[in-house]
Amino acid sequence: MTFTKKNVSVSQGPDPRSSIQKERDSSKWNPQQMNYFLEGSVERSELMKALAQQMERDPILFTDGSYYDLTKDQQRELTAVKINRIARYREQESIDTFNKRLSLIGIFDPQVGTRIGVNLGLFLSCIRGNGTTSQLNYWANEKETADVKGIYGCFGMTELAHGSNVAGLETTATFDKESDEFVINTPHIGATKWWIGGAAHSATHCSVYARLIVDGQDYGVKTFVVPLRDSNHDLMPGVTVGDIGPKMGRDGIDNGWIQFSNVRIPRFFMLQKFCKVSAEGEVTLPPLEQLSYSALLGGRVMMVLDSYRMLARMSTIALRYAIGRRQFKGDNVDPNDPNALETQLIDYPLHQKRLFPYFVPPMSSPSVPSRLNTPSRPPWSNWTSPLKRTTPRLIFKSIDDMKSLFVDSGSLKSTATWLGAEAIDQCRQACGGHGHSSYNGFGKAYNDWVVQCTWEGDNNVLGMSVGKPIVKQVISIEDAGKTVRGSTAFLNQLKEYTGSNSSKVVLNTVADLDDIKTVIKAIEVAIIRLSQEAASIVKKESFDYVGAELVQLSKLKAHHYLLTEYIRRIDTFDQKELAPYLITLGKLYAATIVLDRFAGVFLTFNVASTEAITALASVQIPKLCAEVRPNVVAYTDSFQQSDMIVNSAIGRYDGDIYENYFDLVKLQNPPSKTKAPYSDALEAMLNRPTLDERERFQKSDETAAILSK
């Protein structure tokens, strides 16, 4: 048959590529300059770009769409191969640079980042936080653990029956004076170490949290280094290890379970920076044992950075798709005009309100870890130095510093990881059916991400743990007239905004909503009044009755920290021409992520007027979205995430969403393979004989006639 114009319609297909380029050309500023703000400095920005390019060009570390088709076993093997490769980089660069490399790996291949992080982060941080200088030097340097060589550690805290309640762990470490050894034992199934990353196949050693028992007395949970495998990688006697199996995500991590059956370790394998046990069985406890839990805080700080890099990646995909995707012709377009374009998804106000809030937090986040380690608040590894002296003032200063970081890191970790999980799914939904395709990145990102909401502190439990000291501080101010220091010093304004001043409104008008510093003040007042309300309940009942309020306080504290830090950074940023755009983003964050979500709190405690909250939805948020809209592509470009890091067919830089998507689908699922591997089953179903044939016609009329004679 010859095709002619009479029987074939030829029309121009969609051209999303030109849409994104048009927006890029109309940008008001250079995304690279914005990236300097995002990363905190020109030097850091250039370093991150160089590290990303290095891994893109590395044939082993490079990741593409085939990543989404890997089985569990393939993920495990590939992860091990990548760790072997990454270890070579560790040999040649500083730990600070290597940590930045890991933060990038955590975006595009989080299971690789986690498996390395368990060794360098959790295992070594436990030794750094709980071991002596000599112990740290031995395990980290002499045994080359810090170079990902010789020893590969895992972190043995959680058990099958205990997670959040660390003090309730039941693995035992009983001191044997005669042999000068500890006997590590799993007394029952509930004490089985569980979810231990790296235990199933990789780890040679484990930092085990176990109950110290000397002469029959239980001294609580301490930490011990326990060898799991020998130099041939065979299990040590008495050590039983198993694989937990498939998980919701991060199957490249060999999470395992461990049981110890009277495993003996030398006394000096106990980490003894704080608690010490002599050969005679004398136990020396530290002045304040809270310091021994500082090892976990570093991971929480880095998870904040992970959260916002993931937010940047997910919002980049959804926003680039929303620019190229068109659906429905607007009312101002002739529906019969064949050349009239449909409306870009990005131009629908609802779409803007759904997506715009998620690319704002990444603008303030990369500096958070370094900010939490400023000279005024030294790294957690330095807090224990005052213990070498006997000055009570210095000891309590260390405790105050750690408590302050606990509040900040805990509130930020829980709030940021929750926001990350929410953002991934909202961005997926905003991409319609195509968001459901693995090749567009959302599915694996979500499955890999949500564990962040429960590990290293379950977010609800962590939220309550953060809210509790805030309420206690309010009680100490209210009942004892004490003064609070640190990041919650604003609680000292208690009398100014409670009692006879409890009706003092902070946000009265749209102008108030439009001033970030006024919003920050409103958050402080909301925290003060909510804390006082919770305190009144606690005095009558207990903290168990205010769990929801404590979590709310934790979230508000996180937003207070981020907005305060964001404004501080804008004020000190030397690219002043970008300040108006950054301030607009800050206003959008305050309006959507804070005020809109916590409107009930602000209204209940008279922090905001009804008029202000009404104007928030009808005036402020639509206005800010309209201001942000022209530069959406530039904002996503400012994250400087390459196509490899984004790893999404519909999220590539060129914006050619349909061609890229279709090409990847065909590459990974060749259309030349017209029959499925299970085609025999399908054909057997379709071509099966009739029921009469399968019954050999034994029930036919002819058979009946024969058998009835």
Curated annotation (Swiss-Prot):
Region (Disordered): 1-29
Cellular compartments annotated: Peroxisome
Record pathway: Lipid metabolism; peroxisomal fatty acid beta-oxidation
Primary location group: other
GO biological process, one term: fatty acid beta-oxidation using acyl-CoA oxidase
UniProt subunit comment: Homooctamer.
Protein name: Acyl-coenzyme A oxidase 4
